[in-house]
C-alpha cells in the first residue's frame, strides 16, 4: 500500500503543466506508463500523452484550391426588406436577353434588309430606328438600299449608324440614297463576326458587373441594421447569381461562334 502511494507521488512535472488534460475525465486522458525500480520495488509513473496538433501541409492546402464553393440559396421573401433579389435577378437576365437580341439582329452570316431595321440612329430629335426614317429594300442579292428621301437631314447620321452597327458594313451614299454592299461570306468575314460577338459579350459582362456593383452598394446601406452573417450570405448569393449569368453569356457566345464559323 505504501509503495503504491509513493509511486503516484513520482509523477513527471510535465503532467502538471497540462491543466486541460486534468480537467477531462480519466477515460479521455491518454496515459503513458513507464516502469522502473526504486528501493527494491518496481514502480510505475503515469504521464499524459502530449497532444499533437496536425497542421495542413502546403500540398494539402494546394489540393483544396480550385474546389467549387458550396452554393447558397437565400429565401428572397425573407430578405425583401433588405434588398430585392428578384429585381437583381431580373436586371441580370435583361443583360442576357440584350446580348441574345444583339446576336440575332446584327450577327448573321448573310445580311438581310431586316437586319438593318433596328439600327439606332442618333438624330437632333433623339434616337430612332433606321426603318422609321428610311425606306429599306433589297436592290440585288449583293446590295441593300436605304432611301432617306423622307428625312434627308438624317442621311449623315444614318450612314454613321450603319457603319458603327457592328455588322461589318461599309455604306456608300448617292444623294439621299444609301447603298449598303453585303459582305461576301468568306472565312475572313466569319472571323470578323466572331470577333464582334466577343466584343459584344464583353460589353454585356461590363453591364453585368454594374448590376452586381449596384446591388452590393444597396446592400451596404443595410449593414447598420442587419447582422454581418446575413449580409455575407446575401453577398454570396448575389455573387453566385452573377457567376451563373457570366456562364450563361459564355454559353451563348460559344453557340454563336459555332454558328458563325460553320
Curated annotation (Swiss-Prot):
Origin superkingdom: Eukaryota
Cellular compartments annotated: Mitochondrion
Keyword Protein biosynthesis: yes
Keywords: Mitochondrion, Protein biosynthesis, Transit peptide
Main location: mitochondrion
Swiss-Prot/TrEMBL GO biological process terms: ribosome disassembly; translation
InterPro entries: Ribosome_recyc_fac, Ribosome_recyc_fac_dom, RRF_sf
Gene Ontology, cellular component aspect: mitochondrion
Keyword presence, Transit peptide: yes
Transit peptide boundaries: 1-55
Pfam families linked: RRF (PF01765)
Physiological role: Responsible for the disassembly of ribosomes from messenger RNA at the termination of mitochondrial protein biosynthesis. Acts in collaboration with GFM2. Promotes mitochondrial ribosome recycling by dissolution of intersubunit contacts.
PANTHER family: RIBOSOME RECYCLING FACTOR, RIBOSOME-RECYCLING FACTOR, MITOCHONDRIAL
Family to which this protein belongs: Belongs to the RRF family.
Name this protein carries in UniProt: Ribosome-recycling factor, mitochondrial
Organism name: Mus musculus
Amino acid at each position: 500500500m505504501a509503495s503504491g502511494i509513493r509511486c503516484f507521488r513520482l509523477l513527471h512535472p510535465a503532467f502538471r503543466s497540462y491543466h486541460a488534460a486534468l480537467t477531462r475525465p480519466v477515460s479521455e486522458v491518454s496515459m503513458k506508463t513507464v516502469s522502473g525500480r526504486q528501493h527494491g520495488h518496481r514502480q510505475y509513473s503515469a504521464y499524459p500523452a502530449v497532444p499533437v496538433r496536425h497542421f495542413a501541409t502546403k500540398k494539402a492546402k494546394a489540393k483544396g484550391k480550385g474546389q467549387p464553393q458550396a452554393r447558397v440559396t437565400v429565401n428572397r421573401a425573407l430578405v425583401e426588406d433588405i434588398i430585392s433579389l428578384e429585381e437583381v435577378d431580373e436586371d441580370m437576365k435583361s443583360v442576357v436577353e440584350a446580348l441574345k437580341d444583339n446576336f440575332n439582329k446584327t450577327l448573321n452570316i448573310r445580311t438581310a434588309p431586316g437586319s438593318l431595321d433596328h439600327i439606332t440612329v442618333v438624330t437632333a430629335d433623339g434616337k430612332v430606328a433606321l426603318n422609321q426614317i428610311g425606306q429599306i429594300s433589297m436592290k440585288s442579292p449583293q446590295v441593300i438600299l436605304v432611301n432617306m428621301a423622307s428625312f434627308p437631314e438624317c442621311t449623315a447620321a444614318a450612314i454613321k449608324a450603319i457603319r458603327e452597327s457592328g455588322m461589318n458594313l461599309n455604306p456608300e451614299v448617292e444623294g439621299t440614297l444609301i447603298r449598303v454592299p453585303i459582305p461576301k461570306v468568306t472565312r475572313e468575314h466569319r472571323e470578323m463576326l466572331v470577333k464582334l460577338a466577343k466584343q459584344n459579350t464583353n460589353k454585356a459582362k461590363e453591364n453585368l458587373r454594374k448590376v452586381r456593383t449596384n446591388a452590393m452598394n444597396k446592400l451596404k446601406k443595410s449593414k447598420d441594421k442587419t447582422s454581418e452573417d446575413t449580409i455575407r450570405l446575401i453577398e454570396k448569393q448575389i455573387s453566385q447569381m452573377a457567376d451563373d449569368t457570366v456562364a450563361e453569356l459564355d454559353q451563348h457566345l460559344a453557340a454563336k461562334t459555332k454558328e458563325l464559323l460553320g
